[in-house]
Amino acid sequence: MKDIYDVLVIGAGPAGSIAAKTAAEKGLDVLLIEKRQEIGDPVRCAEGVNKEYLKKHVEIDNSWICADLKGSRIYSPNGTKVEMAEEISGGEVGYVLERKIFDRALAEHAAKAGAEVRVKTRATGLIIEDDFVKGARLMNLGKEYEVRAKIVIGADGVESKVGRWAGIDTSLKPIDIETCAQYLIAGADIDPEYCEFYIGNEIAPGGYVWIFPKGEGKANVGVGILGNRTGKFKPRPVDYLNNFVEKKFPNAKIVEMVFGGVPVSGSIEKTSVNGLMLVGDAARQSDPITGGGILNAMDAGKIAGEAAYEAISSGDVSLEKLEEVYEKRWRETTGHDIDMSLIVKNCFINLKDEDLDSLADSLKEVKFESMRLFDLLQALFKANKKLLWDLRVLFKDAAKEVMKNRT
């Protein structure tokens, strides 16, 4: 490990690895570090991802594909089923990944591009001089290092310390985080071509239950509950999950379990300071509805890698420059989608089960294969006029999208 690099990336998840790869491909000297001894482990993710969006960033390798899905099925509290084709099911439906292999592959891509990759290496603090981030203090195998870099990219996940060290407010209120529990089960009787989502205040208050098939009778089965609806004197996510699994898969065996939190807050006020950018869950760039963050993280990582090159090449790594080449760009793309999802989330978390049943009933006969956003919203909210008003901004956005496609 050297003392000086162009770019130091802290965290080797999808956001960090894509940022490191992109910067290295531009000819920058990049160090990518990961605090764990194995990249991609433990997995804290349902592992679903949209095919076409994924192909924007990587060439598909079957070694990290567990299942190729046709679509998704959503079940309302009374069991009403809404089925959607994969193309319009959202960012988490398409492929089911083996994240342990996938994340390592992304880090390998960064290494092949020229980045230096170090595992079991954690940041213990930032080097800040004259109000500029100049690098970080690292710990590797019990030895301390001081590594300087022209730009630091914080990709250290939902529990990010890098942002706090830099003075960025990344705090989350209970309502802004989904507390999650997930089992990998074997011996499950499950349709291998569809993922399933179950909603309702009895089954997952403020969240949902998911099932992602992984082939050969295996599946990720998990639940996310809003943080303000669990805790002391309230059932825990694992309690909801156990209840669901016992009823749905009485003969299945649990072979792995993971627990964690997912930010569903929407984007934070700023994701950069002098000499530093935040990406992925560290920047709260996950989808506020689903909690899914792989694709948003990869998008932001790519933008950050390109921004690092532009800023360093210009000799200007100030906040003003990073706002121009990173902040502005990701907010106009990924950030816009996050803002729209947050509007939907804030409306839906207050719906009663009978409202959810009514909405599902209005959609159960809809042919989703060819439906556009505007058509979907029209059908969805015939059953709930108040919700239609609360989400009126989405209709305006959908109308703009229709007009843009016509020009």
From Swiss-Prot:
InterPro entries (alphabetical): DGGGPL_reductase, FAD/NAD-bd_sf, Geranylgeranyl_Rdtase_fam, Geranylgeranyl_reductase, GGR_cat
This protein's name: Digeranylgeranylglycerophospholipid reductase
A single GO cellular-component term on record: membrane
Cell membrane is among the record's keywords: no
Cofactor: FAD
Source organism superkingdom: Archaea
Family listed: Belongs to the geranylgeranyl reductase family. DGGGPL reductase subfamily.
The organism of origin for this protein: Methanosarcina acetivorans (strain ATCC 35395 / DSM 2834 / JCM 12185 / C2A)
